[in-house]
Amino acid sequence: MLLIAILEQKVTGKQARQSWRQLLWKYGEPAPGPAPEGMRVFPDADIWRRVPSWEWHAAGVGPQRADTVMRAVKVAASLERTLALGRGGPTVERALRSIPGVGVWTSAETTQRAHGDPDSPSVGDYHLPALVGWALIGKPVDDDGMLELLEPWRGHRQRIMRLIENSGFAKPRFGPRLTIEDHRGR
């Protein structure tokens, strides 16, 4: 889950999913047993360690994110032991954030997915603070404003954010959408 969160850093969700799909298709193995066609198994840390830099580039993953993944897979065994600690918390966050390139947002995204932490809000997300602000008070807010709005739900802040995201509510749009640039051919 950490690897997926790293791939999602500073890019659109569409770009991250394309990168993940390409890497998983190339380095994952077919799922065992009866499984849908094309389903792949997440590669282990040893396989990720052997992915050459040009494959990351070909998948649209820049050098900073690829380097962060490489640092993470070097300590994969110790990170996997954090799963026994339960639903996140300071010890898990410190372990994740000890890896250069893993910050507050990546740590929160990882503890949400891998640890099932219901209270790790994604601080630093490009869209979420404004979405939460528009949904709860009718205007955009920054990270601090989002945390203030979510405070009554401490213990479940991440769940509230996901409920808002999945409710169908959409914040107002004021301009054109971001054009996704493809730098892989350069």
Predicted features, each with a name:
Residues 1-186:
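HhH-family (HhH-GPD) DNA N-glycosylase catalytic core used in base-excision repair
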